[in-house]
Amino acid sequence: YKRQPHTQKLISMFPKVPRFQDFRQMFDKMADKIDAVTVGVPDHAHFPITIEAMAHGKHVYVEKPMARTFQEIEVMMRAEKKFGVVTQMGNQGHSEANYFQFKAWKEAGLIKDVTAITAHMNSPRRWHNWNPNITHMPMGEPVPETLDWDTWLGVRPFHEYNHDYHLGQWR
């Protein structure tokens, strides 16, 4: 598959790093050289990648959401125990300095008697111009030559490509 110019530039900075289009091939070829795995891919791929990594004895940090269903999470919890690994679901927004600063102020006694915290979000998809009221699958479009659509779909049922599914719009 053809690579985007910005991707090619980054790849050229690390010419000796192995690259794989499919995580299963990566584990097949070099699982013994991997200490831990970070999963930051479309939501529907979190479960299969996390399970595969744990089956290889790898600790896993998986981005939110950890999985799509409670059943997937229960399977992950059993796998974590079975394979003796540590697995964590993270949220980069809740791992930033402001949260640690608040904790330090609270522990120092500068902030006392917190009874409630109210948070607001100004849009259901504030990072994208995406219509949250979609009622049907978008029309199919040609798959870009830089994308392996079948691998991207992974465990999802097949449907035609549309740019609205790509670059963070799969939710």
Predicted feature descriptions by range:
Residues 38-41, 45, 106, 121, ...:
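Sec/Tat-exported extracytoplasmic proteins
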Residues 2-59, 71-86:
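N-terminal glycine-/serine-/threonine-rich beta1-alpha1-beta2 phosphate-ribose binding loop
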Residues 1, 152:
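Conserved small/polar residues in nucleotide/adenosyl-binding loops
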Residues 6-7, 126-128, 160-162:
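Short, solvent-exposed loop/turn elements at domain surfaces
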Residues 59-61, 67-146, 151:
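A contiguous active-site-proximal alpha/beta segment in oxidoreductase catalytic domains
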Residues 24-25, 92, 122, 157:
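Residues that form or immediately flank small-molecule/cofactor binding pockets and catalytic motifs
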Residues 154-171:
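Glycine-rich phosphate/pyrophosphate-binding loop
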